[in-house]
């Protein structure tokens, strides 16, 4: 998926997005297990405020139906049989989508839901991605500069 990413699997996606947006140049370093042919192979985290979070979850499900996602799962992330709480004291709702068709469109619709703080979609934010391969070498992917 070129330089579009899903980040925030550890639950710090709001903080990661703030840093990425403030940076002049974003470099992402990942190992080969994170490289996929299309977004959606990994769950998409969505950070939501605690208050009204069940209603926010319902709104997210409506968005996915509106955007014609047919098979999906929407669930609160759990840790020790409790809802996972981020560093910013929010909940994470994980979306299992299998394939994300239009990442920017999906982000725009999700972020418009009351209660959604941020999504783990990093669309057009990364400038360079360094992927560590199993043989110890690296693959470097750079954003094309406009000519």
How would you label these PLM feature ranges?
Residues 1-147:
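Conserved phosphate- and dinucleotide-binding cores of soluble alpha/beta proteins
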């Amino acid at each position: 998926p070129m330089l579009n990413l899903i980040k925030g699997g550890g639950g710090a996606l709001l903080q990661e997005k703030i840093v990425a947006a403030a940076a002049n140049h974003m470099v992402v370093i990942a190992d080969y297990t994170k490289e996929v042919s299309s977004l959606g192979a990994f769950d998409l985290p969505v950070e939501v405020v605690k208050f009204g979070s069940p209603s926010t979850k319902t709104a997210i499900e409506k968005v996915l139906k509106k955007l014609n996602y047919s098979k999906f799962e929407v669930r609160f992330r759990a840790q020790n049989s409790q809802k996972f709480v981020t560093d910013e004291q929010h909940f994470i709702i994980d979306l299992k989508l299998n394939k994300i068709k239009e990442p920017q469109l999906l982000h725009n619709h999700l972020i418009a839901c009351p209660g959604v703080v941020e999504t783990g979609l990093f669309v057009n934010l990364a400038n360079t991605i360094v992927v560590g391969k199993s043989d110890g070498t690296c693959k470097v992917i750079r954003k094309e500069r406009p000519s």
